């Protein structure tokens, strides 16, 4: 039997690889949302925060 792990089991801890990049990613999300006319506010939680 082959000894392997599938992709879902390899990185199941959901740790941020580059925690300092989170602010830049959030800024990018706001910029893209504004280009599409979407207003992001405190009620729009990310999927990471919601689990």
From Swiss-Prot:
Keywords, sorted A to Z = DNA-binding
- PROSITE patterns, per database record: SASP_1 (PS00304)
Pfam families, per this entry?
SASP
Domain of life the protein comes from: Bacteria
Q: Per the UniProt entry, what is one GO biological process? A: DNA topological change
Does Transmembrane appear among the keywords?
no
GO terms of molecular function:
double-stranded DNA binding
Family annotation (PANTHER family): SMALL, ACID-SOLUBLE SPORE PROTEIN A
The UniProt family comment states: Belongs to the alpha/beta-type SASP family.
**What name has this protein been given in UniProt?**
Protein SspM
């Amino acid at each position: 039997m082959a000894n392997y792990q599938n992709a879902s089991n390899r990185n199941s801890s959901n740790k941020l690889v580059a925690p300092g990049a989170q602010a830049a990613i959030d800024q990018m999300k706001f910029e893209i949302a504004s280009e599409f006319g979407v207003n992001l506010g405190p009620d729009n939680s990310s999927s990471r925060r919601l689990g």
